[in-house]
């Protein structure tokens, strides 16, 4: 299977992953993140990362 690795845990957990998921679920934040990066987009919508 080509996607067998998707279920594997990341070797180094990303402490920002929960915030990244919040931003991805907000279409406006997700779109802005594509242009200016996740951390800056999150900050604009939700405050400091």
Swiss-Prot record:
Database matches in PROSITE patterns: GLA_1 (PS00011), GLA_2 (PS50998)
Protein localization: Secreted
UniProt superkingdom: Eukaryota
Keywords noted in UniProt: Biomineralization, Calcium, Disulfide bond, Gamma-carboxyglutamic acid, Hormone, Hydroxylation, Metal-binding, Secreted
Binding site residues for Ca(2+) 1: 17
Residue span, Gla domain: 1-47
Residues found modified as Hydroxyproline: 9
MF-aspect GO terms: calcium ion binding; hormone activity; structural constituent of bone
Binding, Ca(2+) 2: 21, 24
GO cellular component, one term: cytoplasm
InterPro entries in the record: GLA-like_dom_SF, GLA_domain, Osteocalcin, Osteocalcin/MGP
Example GO biological process: cognition
Cysteine disulfide partners in this protein: 23-29
Primary location group: secreted
PANTHER family: OSTEOCALCIN (PTHR14235:SF0)
Family as reported in the entry's similarity comment: Belongs to the osteocalcin/matrix Gla protein family.
Its job: The carboxylated form is one of the main organic components of the bone matrix, which constitutes 1-2% of the total bone protein. It acts as a negative regulator of bone formation and is required to limit bone formation without impairing bone resorption or mineralization. The carboxylated form binds strongly to apatite and calcium.
Name of the protein: Osteocalcin
Organism: Equus caballus
Origin organism lineage: Eukaryota, Metazoa, Chordata, Craniata, Vertebrata
Annotated gene: BGLAP
């Amino acid at each position: 299977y080509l996607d067998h690795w998707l279920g594997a845990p990341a070797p180094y957990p990303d402490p920002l992953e929960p915030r990244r998921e919040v931003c991805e679920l907000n279409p406006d934040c997700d779109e802005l993140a594509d242009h200016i990066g996740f951390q800056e987009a999150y900050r604009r919508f939700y405050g400091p990362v």
